[in-house]
A protein has these predicted regions:
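Glycine-rich, aromatic-lined ligand/substrate-binding cores of catalytic
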Residues: 394, 793-825
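Extracytoplasmic gating/loop element in the C-terminal half of outer-membrane beta-barrel translocons
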Residues: 364, 819-908, 912
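Short, small/polar-rich motifs associated with maturation and membrane association
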Residues: 1-276, 288-290, 930
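Extracellular/periplasmic, surface-exposed regions of secreted and cell-surface proteins
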Residues: 278-287, 293-297, 329-347, 353-415, ...
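Outer-membrane beta-barrel proteins
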Residues: 104-147, 167-172, 215-235, 254-292, ...
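A generic structural motif
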Residues: 65, 255, 525-527, 694, ...
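Conserved small-residue
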Residues: 155-212, 305-306, 310-312, 580, ...
């Protein structure tokens, strides 16, 4: 495979490099370089538009320019720090979005920042109307770099850095765990010699004198984990061309280690090789073409098992993963023979430990269970042809695009089995020895490589469009786009394809570059609906006014640009129609009841799963938005702001409340209730971008601020609650619901005087006490209330601040992001500790008679804890945070130093990512309990241009 990859890379580089031609001519582009910088072309739906002519709902990031001061490794890395309207999760608070790379639906994680020219965020409904159904919730359009006319330019960039874990979970050691577990048994009335740990056992575990007999297992010890993991990458870019052909090539490779330092896991790694080539060809004065290809080879190697999940569950006193062979009594020939015959002697001196209850464990898995490799391959190809039809009609052009993408992935593994040994310990003359050894399991290494998890995906996209541009009498500027587009995505083991097909029209008119009218429409199609409802019309209209071009501002030297616009749209989408044939009725016998028939035979009933609704139709996005943009003081200050209000109407559910109760039965399970367009959601919000450029002395400063705020409301729901406070209608759509607490029960009298709590178990002092919202003297689900916003689609308020300072060859860059207004529950097993769960440091604040006035945690229990461990404001915390996301210092060698040399540019930089979190809940927000830790990343890099 490695030889194949190298040949492929060399062929691609030679092919693209050969396009470079001596004596390249200068560009004859009518737009000057200075104009491109002040008013660049921006990729919007199926066309490029001058940034000053965009009438709102669109933001753009120049990634190529950004990388000069902020090197990063993910295409969407902290984009909320640069543009308003994107909060890191969604556009304008919607619950989905479409990612396009060079106009084709693709994955954002399969294009690196070094390959990207610009990213356009199309937020408003008017901006995405031409994309049809699948683009109705917003589009992120990523355009890759292309070749330019000029000499061949070779750029090489290399980076290496280290991820350093921010924090690890803190679990109790064996002795403390055993002590508190005994306390939990006492609380439950279950303590006794057969259930409780003895004082002697607790003492022996506490001393640490023999951790093999009395283990005190710490998953986060330096015995198992490295302090950091390395990530290194190298990228080569080659570009150039002449007036006939231009090319761009990107070849990149990165490798990343893992934290583990033992067993098969010490060789864990992932690596990615990518080759991209983009070619533009001027066939003749009337025809242009482009051919783009990209190939990605991704591999990951991992030991068998999930270490981080095991670390959250395996108690510290359960096992000793490795036991020295030297502890076996010297005259125990049988045990020594049994151990020496195993296939898994670790480091020549340890055998795998376990218990009869723990016949496998993650440590033994990492040493002896084998390993797996994940392999992913992607090939992407697209071609475009542009026809200038001026001989037919001046200003008329035609463009067409065709793309085919293939992606495949699979797992290969060596799946071994192993035995563990359970020692029986004795003490002779004060020394611990293993007097007997039990073996459980079978050692087996078949040497067979297994293949599993094979998946394939194919995407085919096509578009064809006519474009028309003309100016009448120097004041009437008209442009239009008529586009037909569609794509299909086929996935293995999925019968129906994901499809999108639409016909779109956009007509733009402006008078004297002052008054703008944009009219857009698309005819969308969906096979997920019944015949007669599969097509829908989506209109959009925008009015704009460039005040700067009015006479009353024409001579205002402080105002460079001032534009106001307003848009209204109704888009139809099938994105929330999850399956095909939801409009059809459905019957089956899966939940049918058995009933007797003749001669003792039984028959199962055929039941209705749902009724039919042939009137099921598209969900509608109805939106009104306004936008203002300005540039002041010779581009010293630029600002853009949008306000939006939209309603997603006709979301599909099965509305039980509008049908008689007998339409559904619980046994046998049956229903005649069909799917229907019923639920409605409303979102209201704004986004702001402000940029300030200023030179102070010899330092050039650039300060950018971005903000996004949105509020949501469930305006219609299928509900029939007994009490108004239970209704979801009128509340935030990402609402978190739960009980309100009144602290802990103080004593038995307090329990008897309070409403009965019906969640299970016997209520005792130290349990959580809840508010009886409806005063029915019972605490149950009817007492759950709205507690706050979950921020499922991004924080309600998102902030971003970026600062650039340039002094001679030095550049300082800093980026901060913040999210405010959301809440979350501490509801993982790290916080909800009960039964035989692993005890975290949180339980130290448990309620006892001695700590009843200061307790921060309910009484301990070995039972389910159903009363305490449920959603309530006791477990609620605010996720408000500000992150120092990036700091980078760069240095560019002066041009004078590089004169007459082969090097045109040399720059070096150091950076740190995810450096600081400012929050009252910092420790909670920075902690991962069942996955790899969050990390700070420290990087050093160099870039050389030939």
């Amino acid at each position: 495979m490695k030889k194949t990859n190298i040949r492929f890379i060399l062929c691609m580089m030679i092919a693209f490099s050969s396009l470079q031609t001596i004596g390249a001519k200068k560009s004859s582009d009518s737009i000057t370089d200075s104009l491109k910088k002040t008013d660049p072309l921006v990729q919007v739906a199926y066309r490029n538009v001058l940034q000053s002519n965009i009438m709102g709902g669109v933001s753009v990031v120049d990634v190529e320019d950004l990388l000069k001061k902020n090197y990063n490794t993910y295409s969407m890395d902290n984009m909320q720090g640069y543009v308003g309207g994107w909060n890191g999760n969604s556009l304008w608070g919607m619950d989905d979005y479409l990612v396009l790379i060079d106009g084709v639906p693709r994955d954002a994680n399969n294009v690196l920042p070094t390959e990207i020219d610009k990213i356009t965020f199309l937020k408003s409904a008017s901006a995405v109307v031409l994309y049809g159904s699948r683009g109705a919730k917003g589009v992120i359009s990523i355009t890759t770099k292309r070749g330019r006319i000029g000499d061949r330019v070779v750029s090489v960039r290399a980076n290496t850095g280290y991820n350093v874990a921010k924090s690890y979970p803190k679990y109790l050691g064996s002795a403390e765990y055993m002590t508190l577990y005994n306390e939990a048994l006492t609380n439950d009335g279950l303590a006794g010699p057969s259930t409780s740990y003895s004082d002697e056992a607790i003492y022996n575990h506490s001393t640490g004198l023999n951790p093999y007999r009395y283990p005190d297992l710490n998953f986060y010890s330096s015995d198992y984990l490295r302090k950091s993991l390395n990530r290194s990458d190298v990228t080569a870019e080659i570009s150039g061309g002449n007036d006939r052909a231009q090319f761009y090539t990107n070849v990149s490779y990165y490798n990343q280690e893992d934290y583990f330092k033992f067993g098969q896991a010490k060789d864990n790694n992932l690596n990615r090789l990518n080759v991209r080539g983009n070619i533009d060809i001027n066939v003749n004065p009337f025809i242009k073409a482009s051919v783009d290809a990209n190939a990605t080879f991704y591999n990951a190697r991992n030991a068998k098992g999930d270490y981080w999940a095991a670390a959250s569950t395996l108690r510290p006193n359960r096992i000793s993963p490795l036991v020295p062979i030297s502890f076996i009594e010297s005259n125990d020939i049988n045990s020594l023979t049994m151990v020496n015959n195993t296939l898994n002697i670790i480091d020549g001196k340890y055998f795998l430990g376990g218990t009869q209850q723990d016949l496998t464990n993650i440590f033994a898995d990492y040493y002896a269970a084998g390993y797996s490799k994940y392999t992913s391959r992607q090939f992407q190809f697209d071609t475009k042809i542009d026809f200038d039809l001026r001989k037919v009609l001046q200003g008329l052009t035609f463009n067409t695009m065709f793309a085919v993408d293939y992606a495949t992935s699979y797992n290969t593994s060596f799946d071994n089995t192993y035995s563990v040994f359970v020692p029986s310990w004795s003490n002779y003359n004060g020394a611990d020895v293993i007097s007997q050894l039990g073996k459980f399991g079978v050692d087996k290494k078949s040497g067979v490589q297994n293949i599993s998890g094979s998946t394939d995906r194919q995407t085919i996209a096509f578009s064809g469009q006519f474009n028309y541009n003309t100016t009448i009498n120097d004041v009437h500027n008209i442009s239009a786009v008529l586009v037909g587009a569609g794509y299909q995505r086929t996935e293995s083991e999925v019968y129906h394809r994901i499809t999108n097909a639409n016909l779109g029209l956009m007509v733009n008119y402006n008078y004297a570059n002052k008054y703008f009218v944009d009219l857009g429409a698309s005819e969308v199609h969906s096979a997920r609906l019944a015949e007669g409802n599969r097509n829908a019309f989506s209109p959009s209209a925008t009015l704009g006014w460039k005040l700067k071009n009015e006479n009353f501002l024409a001579n205002a030297s402080d105002v460079d640009e001032l534009t106001l616009s307003a848009s209204g749209s109704i888009l139809n989408t099938d994105m929330d129609i999850s399956n095909y044939y939801m409009y059809e009725s459905n019957y089956n016998q899966a939940g049918g009841a058995w009933w007797g028939w003749y001669d003792g035979a039984s028959e199962r009933s055929t039941n209705s799963v749902r009724g039919a609704n042939k009137d099921l139709t598209f969900i509608k996005r109805k939106e009104f938005s306004v936008n203002a943009s300005t540039s002041l003081f010779k581009n010293t200050v630029s600002a853009n702001a949008s306000f939006f209000i939209n309603s997603m109407e006709g979301l599909i559910i099965r509305p039980a409340t509008i049908y008689p109760s007998y339409f559904s039965t619980y046994y046998p399970e049956a229903s005649f209730i069909p799917y229907a367009n019923f639920n409605n959601n409303k979102r209201t919000g704004f986004d702001v971008n402000v940029n300030l450029k200023k030179r102070i002395g010899a330092v050039d400063f650039n300060l950018g601020v971005a903000a996004t705020y949105y509020s949501s409301e469930a305006t219609k729901r299928d509900e029939n609650y007994q009490y108004d406070y239970q209704n979801r209608t009128g509340k935030q759509i990402d609402g978190v619901w739960g009980l309100q607490t009144l602290g802990f029960f103080a004593d038995a009298q307090d329990v008897s005087n309070s409403p009965a709590q019906k969640f299970g178990g016997i209520i005792k002092p130290g349990d959580l006490k809840y508010v009886d919202q409806n005063n029915d003297n019972v605490i149950d689900e009817k007492d759950e209330v709205y507690l706050g916003r979950g921020g499922w689609y991004g924080a309600p308020l998102t902030l971003g601040v970026n600062l650039t300072a340039k002094y001679k060859g030095f550049t300082f860059f800093a980026l901060g992001t913040g999210g405010y207004g959301a809440v979350a529950m501490k509801n993982s097993t790290y916080y909800w500790v009960y039964g035989n769960g692993k005890y975290s440091e949180n339980v130290r604040g448990r309620w006892t008679e001695a700590t009843k006035e200061t307790a921060t945690y309910p009484r301990l229990t070995t039972l389910t804890g159903a009363n305490n461990f449920r959603n309530s404001d006791f477990w609620l915390y605010k996720t408000d945070r500000f992150n120092l996301a990036k700091v980078q210092i760069s240095y560019d060698l002066p041009k004078s130093v590089l004169e007459n040399g082969i090097l045109k540019e040399v720059s070096a930089y150091i950076s740190g990512s995810n450096l600081l979190t400012v929050s009252k809940q910092r420790e909670v927000l920075e902690l991962n309990t069942t996955s790899a830790p969050q990390a700070r990343f420290y990087n050093v890099g160099v870039k050389v241009v030939f």
